[in-house]
Amino acid sequence: MKKKFYTLLLLTLFFTSISIASSDFSIEEVSRDLIVFSQNGQQGLIVINENNSIVVDPMNQETTKNIQNFLASNGKPMISRIIYSHSHWDRISTGKTTLNKDIAVIAQQECSLYLSTNNKDVLGPTIYFQDYFEITDGRKKIDLYYYGPSHGECMIVIHLVEENLLFIPDLLHTKGASFPRDATLPYLRPSTLINFFNELEKLVQKKKIKSFIGGHKEDKLIGSTSIIAEQKIFWELMQKTAEQAEIDGIINLDNFIDLEQLDLQPYQQYDNYDSEDLINIIRRYTSFLNMGR
């Protein structure tokens, strides 16, 4: 894989004003037609076809301009479609003047609650789908799957069929099962999370998918899909711990667990372990068990 870093000083192509691009914009070529771009710690995809390019999660206006400049300066076709992997604005705020008005924007139906009129910088989807959507363009085929609320209400996984590679925007780390990036878990949906992982495992087995790319920049660009089962075990452990803690009476009135009453060894094996994070995660699960939220 080839890695290229671009410090873009003047972006005059396709834009009405001169912009200065951030020096941390980078691309990494997975294959001739599949490129991972990253900026500010987040990652998305560019899928290049003969006559057009498809972008997954263009992040923001600056990143979108960097992508367009990269395509133009390398003789690549310009963007014709955008796929939103979920509704969080830090991944989809392109600005409405940056892109051609004829661009198709694809998102899962549940995203509509957040994308209707809430953010003027988010280009509204032109296509919504429920559980599955297929994009076929020339020899390229991209499958979009929705397995219910997981990281927010509408996160999807994307199967790049030619490469037999998954793009999973959140909930997984390419280096292995881990504590979450944000232990306050503002977007986690415990009621349907395990079902999400179950369905993801079925997809991987059915399609014989061995590798995935995540939505956050990490030391390893590509991870093994065996991590899916390992991460599911982590979340099952969190729920079982919360359930047992309630039975044992070691949860106080504010839903905080007494860690001194807990054997920490099963949790310390996971990357990014932090005792305070463990307390917050268990609190999230006890809140779910007690209130259904």
Language model features: what each stretch is:
Residues 1-9:
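Bacterial N-terminal signal peptides that target proteins for export
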Residues 8-17:
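Bacterial N-terminal signal peptides
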Residues 19-23:
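Boundary at the C-terminal end of the N-terminal hydrophobic targeting segment
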Residues 24, 28-30, 53, 60, 109-154, 161-162, ...:
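Metallo-beta-lactamase
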Residues 25-69, 157-170:
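Conserved beta-strand hairpin/beta-sheet module of binuclear metal-dependent hydrolase folds
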Residues 65, 69-136:
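Active-site HxH/HxHxD metal-binding segment of metal-dependent hydrolases
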Residues 204-211, 218-293:
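Accessory terminal helices/loops
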